[in-house]
Regions:
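Gram-negative outer-membrane beta-barrel transporters
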Residues: 1-91, 154-158
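Short, glycine/acidic-rich beta->alpha junctions
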Residues: 2, 100-101
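Short, basic/aromatic-rich helical patch in the C-terminal catalytic core of site-specific tyrosine
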Residues: 8, 107-109
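Outer-membrane beta-barrel domain signature
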Residues: 47-53, 93-98, 140-144
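Transmembrane beta-barrel architecture of outer membranes
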Residues: 57-61, 102-106, 140, 148-150
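C-terminal beta-signal and adjacent terminal beta-strands/loops
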Residues: 82-90, 111-159
Length: 159
């Protein structure tokens, strides 16, 4: 297998209260000499040139957070965005294992005072559905999907 790539993470504190973080990953992956029976039929084939499963070419993320004092408590907010390129989840690169690229946005805002906090949060705010995994083989194929847009409020107390 031959892999070439890099990852970049940048963090910047804009002010004492405001942080930014950016991540980027690039990956080029390919099997060079890959002799194997990928279908279970007992025949070994040359699979050189296939792309290893679950290896997206590009990934990207952005997060910003802000914290400030309000009254006797602390207000914290955070927004995150992530992108993952299309990829294939099957070792033989079966088209049924193709997973589309995805984008996702999550956010939280919370207030803490003394031992109590309340946080309003949202996951998958764009309600983008993504297949997380696909398994192909035998008589069955299956896949798992991410959670839909989910909103909530969390109340917490610590003692």
């Amino acid at each position: 297998m031959e892999m070439t790539g890099f990852e970049l993470e940048l963090m910047y504190q804009v002010t004492e209260a405001w942080d930014l973080m950016v991540t980027y990953g690039y990956l080029e992956a390919e099997y060079k000499d890959y002799l194997a029976d990928l279908t279970g039929d007992g025949i070994i084939t040359d699979n050189s040139g296939l792309i290893p499963r679950n290896t997206p070419e590009n990934t990207f993320g952005f997060t910003t957070s802000y914290t400030t004092q309000i009254g006797d408590g602390e207000l914290k907010g955070r927004i995150s965005y992530r992108f993952r390129d299309e990829m294939n989840s099957d070792s033989s690169n079966n088209p049924y294992g193709d997973l589309d690229s995805i984008e996702n946005v999550n956010a939280t805002i919370g207030y803490t005072i003394d031992n109590y906090s309340v946080t309003v949060w949202g996951r998958n705010l764009t309600d983008e559905r993504e297949q997380r995994w696909a398994t192909i083989g035998g008589l069955t194929s299956r896949g798992w999907w991410n959670e839909p847009q989910t909103l909530g409020i969390t109340f917490a107390a610590s003692y």
